[in-house]
């Protein structure tokens, strides 16, 4: 598995689902909603922005991977990785000891950076596509956090299973 696949939905959706189920099992519904909701909101917003801008992929002479068939802006792999790892970092600071949460944050930052770099290296995105994906992900994670108080069922502290 190449590093770029850390931003793929084939990996992130099952990983997110398992993590959300574990959080729900332990009564951490707010954290589960943050992780799952952030990823879903990011997926939807990335595809909406791609359709709005319709930016072609970079021209290339040597393809290192098969050229994706959708639009370039913003980078979906980078946005998805950023949304997942940012929300996991926020949850880590809520449920883990600070020293462990700091390790999660550092690892998350590193993984998002190398996923973004890999998209540029593989010549399937421009730098701005990758940066826009990161910004869009941060906005979606923030939006989910801001909307959470509006979900009354989250306020009840009970186990869902």
Language-model features: locations:
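Hydrophobic alpha-helical bundle signature of multipass membrane enzymes
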Residues: 1-71, 87-94, 98, 102-107
């Amino acid at each position: 598995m190449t590093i770029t696949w850390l931003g793929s939905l084939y990996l992130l959706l099952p990983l997110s689902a398992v993590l959300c189920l574990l959080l729900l099992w332990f009564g951490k519904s707010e954290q589960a909603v943050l992780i799952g909701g952030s990823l879903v909101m990011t997926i939807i917003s990335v595809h909406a922005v791609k359709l709005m801008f319709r930016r072609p992929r970079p021209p290339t002479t040597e393809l290192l991977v098969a050229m994706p068939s959708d639009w370039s802006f913003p980078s979906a792999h980078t946005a998805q990785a950023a949304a997942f790892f940012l929300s996991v970092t926020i949850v880590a600071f809520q449920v883990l000891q600070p020293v462990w949460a700091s390790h999660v944050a550092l690892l998350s930052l590193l993984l998002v950076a190398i996923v973004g770099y890999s998209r540029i290296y593989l010549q399937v995105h421009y730098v701005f596509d990758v940066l826009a994906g990161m910004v869009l992900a941060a906005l979606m994670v923030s939006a989910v956090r801001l909307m959470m108080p509006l979900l009354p069922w989250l306020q009840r502290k009970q186990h869902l299973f």
